[in-house]
Amino acid sequence: MALPLKVLSRSMASAAKGDHGGAGANTWRLLTFVLALPGVALCSLNCWMHAGHHERPEFIPYHHLRIRTKPFAWGDGNHTLFHNPHVNPLPTGYEHP
């Protein structure tokens, strides 16, 4: 009685069938080349086309940001180590390039 149940249960297993997922691999390969790679290419193109269209936001001097209790040890003491004048404002506002 136990033998037919065991034979039936092993026939449901994928390892007993001998198929190692070749159809699943082909499906994922197709999805990668048809959907994923063109999607990444379109998103990259969109980012590249709109990269230079950003305007500098208005400076609002919040009292809890850019607090300088002592000067930095480099430069004039007011600029951070990796200061970028295009995007990083000083406590008084943006620098004019």
UniProtKB/Swiss-Prot annotation:
Pfam families in alphabetical order: COX6A
GO terms under biological process: oxidative phosphorylation
Stored InterPro entries: Cyt_c_oxidase_su6a, Cyt_c_oxidase_su6a_CS, Cyt_c_oxidase_su6a_sf
Major place of residence: mitochondrion
Membrane spanning stretches: 26-46
This protein's UniProt keywords: Membrane, Mitochondrion, Mitochondrion inner membrane, Oxidoreductase, Transit peptide, Transmembrane, Transmembrane helix
Domain of life the protein comes from: Eukaryota
Location relative to the cell: Mitochondrion inner membrane
Residue interval of the organelle targeting sequence: 1-12
Annotated S-S bridges: none
Recorded GO CC terms: mitochondrial inner membrane; mitochondrion; respiratory chain complex IV
CDD domains documented for this protein: Cyt_c_Oxidase_VIa
Lipid bilayer topology: Single-pass membrane protein
GO MF terms, alphabetically ordered: oxidoreductase activity
Traits of the deletion mutant: Knockout mice show significant decline of COX activity and assembly in skeletal muscle. In particular, complexes IV, IV(2) and III(2)IV(2), and supercomplex I(1)III(2)IV(1) are reduced, whereas levels of complexes I, II, and III are normal.
Stretches in topological domain Mitochondrial intermembrane: 47-97
Keyword Oxidoreductase: yes
UniProt key word Transit peptide: yes
Pathway: Energy metabolism; oxidative phosphorylation
Residue ranges, Mitochondrial matrix side: 13-25
Function: Component of the cytochrome c oxidase, the last enzyme in the mitochondrial electron transport chain which drives oxidative phosphorylation. The respiratory chain contains 3 multisubunit complexes succinate dehydrogenase (complex II, CII), ubiquinol-cytochrome c oxidoreductase (cytochrome b-c1 complex, complex III, CIII) and cytochrome c oxidase (complex IV, CIV), that cooperate to transfer electrons derived from NADH and succinate to molecular oxygen, creating an electrochemical gradient over the inner membrane that drives transmembrane transport and the ATP synthase.
Family affiliation: Belongs to the cytochrome c oxidase subunit 6A family.
Subunit structure: Component of the cytochrome c oxidase (complex IV, CIV), a multisubunit enzyme composed of 14 subunits. The complex is composed of a catalytic core of 3 subunits MT-CO1, MT-CO2 and MT-CO3, encoded in the mitochondrial DNA, and 11 supernumerary subunits COX4I, COX5A, COX5B, COX6A, COX6B, COX6C, COX7A, COX7B, COX7C, COX8 and NDUFA4, which are encoded in the nuclear genome.
Name of the protein described by the UniProt record: Cytochrome c oxidase subunit 6A2, mitochondrial
Species the sequence originates in: Mus musculus (Mouse)
